[in-house]
């Protein structure tokens, strides 16, 4: 499992905080926007492509408010994503929605909160069962 991360210019600093946190915790991290100045649309598409390339990969995209990247991610066939700004949502979107991507806003979420959101997201496990009905409904929409 790899954690694929990316950001636009507004999210670059927070992306580096998250990347350091993940690397410190021994996660395999791929930064698809390292050394690049990209729009949130391109950052999100690059993260989603790598997430979908291998089962088990997860993605994190940071822009100014999280909403733009979220809208892009949800347009991608087969991608379930969540815009999150609290720890519980980061964890629960894995457990109940089987989200493979989260988006966050660097102007909404501070460093410590971002690390806690990411911790919940990457440590969360999909519960399946009754939640699979909704996941199937989401996938059928694509």
UniProtKB/Swiss-Prot annotation:
Isomerase in keyword set = yes
Keywords (A to Z) from UniProt: Isomerase, Lactose metabolism
Pathway info: Carbohydrate metabolism; D-galactose 6-phosphate degradation; D-tagatose 6-phosphate from D-galactose 6-phosphate: step 1/1
The record, for SUPFAM superfamilies, names: Ribose/Galactose isomerase RpiB/AlsB (SSF89623)
Catalyzed chemical reaction(s): aldehydo-D-galactose 6-phosphate = keto-D-tagatose 6-phosphate
**Family of the protein in this entry:** Belongs to the LacAB/RpiB family.
Q: How does it assemble?
A: Heteromultimeric protein consisting of LacA and LacB.
Mind telling me what this protein is named? Galactose-6-phosphate isomerase subunit LacA
Origin organism is Staphylococcus aureus (strain NCTC 8325 / PS 47)
Give the gene name: lacA
């Amino acid at each position: 499992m790899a954690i694929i991360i990316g950001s636009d210019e507004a999210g670059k600093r927070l992306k580096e905080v998250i990347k350091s946190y993940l690397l410190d915790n021994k996660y395999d991290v791929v930064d698809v926007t390292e050394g690049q100045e990209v729009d949130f649309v391109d950052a999100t598409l690059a993260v989603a492509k790598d997430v979908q390339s291998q089962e088990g990969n997860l993605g994190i995209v940071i822009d100014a408010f999280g909403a733009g990247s979220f809208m892009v991610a949800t347009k991608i066939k087969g991608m379930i994503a969540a815009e999150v700004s609290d720890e519980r949502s980061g964890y629960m979107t894995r457990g109940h929605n089987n989200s493979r991507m989260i988006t966050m806003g660097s102007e909404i979420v501070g460093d410590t909160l971002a690390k806690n959101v990411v911790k919940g997201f990457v440590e969360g496990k999909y519960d399946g069962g009754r939640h699979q009905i909704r996941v199937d409904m989401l996938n059928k929409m694509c």
